[in-house]
Amino acid sequence: RGLEPDRGWINLMFVRKANRRQGIAKMMVEEIEHRLCALGVKRITLAAYSPNYFFPGIDVEGYPEAIFFFEHMGYEGIESSYSMSKDLHDYHMPETWISKKEEAEKTGFRFGSFEGKDALEILEFAKNEFGGGWKRNLLMAMRVGEAEDVVTVVKYQDHIVGFAMRKIDGNVMRFGPIGVGRKFRDAGIGGILFEMKQQEMCSKGIYHLFFVSTDDPGRRFYE
C-alpha cells in the first residue's frame, strides 16, 4: 500500500514458463487480494505504483496472456499508458515558445528554479492538485538535496501554480512529473515548463529525455 489507505497494488508478478497453466498465478493473486483486503484495501491497481513501478501497466502487445488472465480474475482496463522519449542534441527553445514565455511573464507569471523557501508551499500544492505520489516525488528530491537542481516552478502573484521536475528515480534523463494547477491550465504554461526543462537538460549535457508513463491526452501534448 502507499499513501491511499483503501488502494493496493500488485507491482510485479511472474511465473516460470514451464510452470504456467497450473493455477500458480491464480493462487498468488488470490493470496495477495486476501492480504490487502485484510488491511482495508477496496481496490487494487496493477503495476502503476508511481514512482516505483517496474512497468506503468501491462504491456498489451507484449503480454496478451496476462491481459486475458487478469480480466478472467475480474480486473478491468481503465486507461492506456505510453512510454516516450526524445533526443535533445542541439536542442534550442523555439522562438514561438520564447515569445509565449515572455507574454506569460507580462501577465504576471514567473518561472524559475525551486528554492528552499518554496518547500512547504510546493508540497501542499502537489498534494492538493495531483495527489500524494507527486508530493512524495518532491519530498525525496528535497531530502537528497537535489530539488534546486531538478525542479522548475512557475508562480503567479507569488504563489506556486505549477512545476516540472526530473530524475525521480535517480536517472538524470527521466522527465516528470509536470503539472499546472486547475485554474491555470489551457493557458500554455505546461508547454513553457516543458520547453524550459528541455533547454535546461541540454545545457547540462543531458541529451536524452524519457518518461515511462503518460495517458492519451499526455501523449497528444508531447507529440
Question: What are these model-predicted stretches?
Answer:
Residues 30-105:
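Acyl-donor-binding surface of acyltransferase catalytic domains
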Residues 194, 215-218:
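Short glycine/proline-centered loop/turn elements that form peptide/ligand docking sites
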Residues 109-122:
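A short beta-loop-alpha structural element at the N-terminal edge
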Residues 123-127:
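A conserved mid-domain beta-alpha-beta active-site/ligand-binding segment of alpha/beta enzyme cores
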Residues 15, 21-37, 180, 186-199:
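Conserved acetyl-CoA-binding loop-helix of GNAT-fold acetyltransferases
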Residues 10, 44-46, 175, 209-213:
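Conserved hydrophobic beta-strand within the GNAT/NAT acetyltransferase core sheet
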Residues 1-20:
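Active-site-proximal cofactor/substrate-binding loop regions of enzyme domains
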Residues 1-7, 130-182:
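A conserved beta-strand-loop-helix scaffold within acyl/acetyltransferase catalytic domains
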